[in-house]
């Protein structure tokens, strides 16, 4: 992590439980990020926090540190706890899995057990893990409610509640589920509650007011909505040139880890077909992709076995992927906030990133609202039609496709 991204607050100077402090030091956590520096002095003191922070700012470690500290300092060694003592809710299963992975080193050091509860698959495996005993339950609202209604778990011993990406939970229609679960937990005054959201909108503040105990609000505002470490670039391609321009820029930029966004499932499939035919190691992430395949693709991408993900906004929500070097907006999004969410997947945690957008004939009308929202014009670049690569015959999903991890090679079939 870049030093200029960190604050002057050291973890070692915070009143942390010795086990948590030691685990953080062993993992290489020395200085806090700004959201950690602001939130931890509050949460470690047992007070509720409602924080505004984008993904990639260190908020996950902020609430995990506070959660493990609180459980370790509020446990009776003479008692056995048959039910979870902490509940961490996320809007998507992928984010829940990521949080669980991030918590592993703290769980190992402390002896506290974590378990996952998310829909899609793994029902019996998750159930077995919970029945073996769990201190910290991490999951999505639907599956957690299933287990509560079946009597598999009770929430009456919950000491910590975390709501991550609360604004996305609202967007996905989970607010009724959240309130159901919170009503099953002890009263707000009897637990520590932490809420994090990219925006502290009226509806998020209303939830905090009703279901938290006088939370302290903290906000980490980026210097600009799109992040000053992200290099933005805009092209005006014709519909005819658009795909060839994407392939040409892929050859020119040769991104180490890239996400290409499009507005529809059909367009994503088309992009995947051309990139795969051009020899790129590319995965497709749309709402139709099965849960096991989604997790497999995410692991391949994270491990470096895939270089490119082609995704819709809905399918990519909640994905926390480090070291993304490039984001391509093949289609400008209809929602201006989605532009910020998309390109915010690069340039995280102090690293630099590149965002390249296409203002084509179909979606150029979305550009004025986007530029008004981000507060600046996106620099425009030109291209020469004669220099664009010739399009290969695309792969089709209906046909047999090559393995997604086949060897990547450069294409030299320019016009």
UniProtKB/Swiss-Prot annotation:
Reactions performed catalytically: ATP + H2O = ADP + phosphate + H(+)
Motif Q motif: positions: 9-37
Family: Belongs to the DEAD box helicase family. RhlB subfamily.
Protein name: ATP-dependent RNA helicase RhlB
A single GO cellular-component term on record: cytosol
InterPro entries in the record: DEAD/DEAH_box_helicase_dom, DEAD_box_RNA_helicase, Helicase_ATP-bd, Helicase_C-like, P-loop_NTPase, RNA-helicase_DEAD-box_CS, RNA_helicase_ATP-dep_RhlB, RNA_helicase_DEAD_Q_motif
HAMAP family: DEAD_helicase_RhlB
Quaternary structure annotation from Swiss-Prot or TrEMBL: Component of the RNA degradosome, which is a multiprotein complex involved in RNA processing and mRNA degradation.
Its job: DEAD-box RNA helicase involved in RNA degradation. Has RNA-dependent ATPase activity and unwinds double-stranded RNA.
Compartment(s) where it occurs, according to its Swiss-Prot or TrEMBL record: Cytoplasm
EC number: 3.6.4.13
């Amino acid at each position: 992590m870049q030093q200029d991204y960190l604050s002057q607050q050291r973890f070692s100077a915070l009143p942390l439980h010795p086990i948590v402090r030691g685990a953080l030091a062993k993992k290489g956590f020395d200085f806090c990020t700004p959201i950690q520096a602001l939130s931890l002095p509050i949460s470690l003191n047992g007070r509720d926090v409602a924080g505004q922070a984008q993904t990639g700012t260190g908020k996950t470690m902020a609430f995990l540190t506070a959660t493990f500290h609180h459980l370790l300092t509020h446990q009776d060694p003479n008692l056995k706890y048959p039910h979870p003592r902490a509940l961490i809710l996320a809007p998507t299963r992928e984010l829940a899995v990521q949080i669980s992975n991030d918590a592993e080193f703290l769980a190992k050091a402390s002896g506290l057990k974590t378990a996952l509860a998310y829909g899609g698959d793994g029902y019996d495996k998750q159930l077995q893990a919970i029945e073996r005993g769990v201190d910290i339950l991490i999951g999505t609202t639907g599956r957690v409610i299933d287990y509560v209604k079946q009597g598999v778990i009770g929430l009456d011993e919950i000491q910590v509640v975390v709501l991550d990406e609360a604004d996305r939970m609202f967007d996905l229609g989970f607010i009724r589920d959240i309130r159901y679960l919170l009503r099953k937990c002890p009263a707000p005054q009897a637990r520590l509650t932490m809420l994090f959201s990219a925006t502290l909108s009226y509806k998020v503040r209303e939830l905090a007011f009703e279901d938290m105990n006088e939370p302290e609000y903290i906000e980490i505002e980026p210097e600009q909505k799109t992040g000053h470490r992200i290099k933005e670039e805009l092209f005006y391609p014709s519909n005819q040139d658009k795909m060839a321009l994407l392939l040409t820029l892929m050859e020119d930029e040769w991104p180490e880890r890239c996400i290409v966004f499009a507005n529809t499932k059909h367009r994503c499939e088309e992009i995947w077909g051309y990139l795969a035919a051009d020899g790129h190691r590319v995965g497709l992430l749309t709402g139709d992709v099965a849960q096991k395949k989604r997790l497999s693709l995410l692991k391949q991408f994270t491990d470096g076995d895939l270089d490119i993900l082609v995704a819709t906004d809905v399918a990519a929500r909640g994905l926390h992927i480090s070291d993304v070097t490039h984001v391509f907006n093949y289609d400008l999004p209809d929602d201006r906030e989605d532009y910020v969410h998309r390109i915010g997947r690069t340039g995280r945690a102090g690293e630099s990133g590149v965002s390249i957008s296409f203002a084509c004939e179909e979606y150029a009308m979305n550009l004025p609202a986007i530029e008004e929202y981000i507060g600046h014009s996106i620099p425009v670049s030109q291209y020469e039609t004669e220099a664009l690569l010739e399009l290969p015959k695309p792969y089709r999903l209906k046909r047999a496709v090559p393995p997604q991890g086949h060897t990547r090679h450069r294409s030299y079939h320019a016009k």
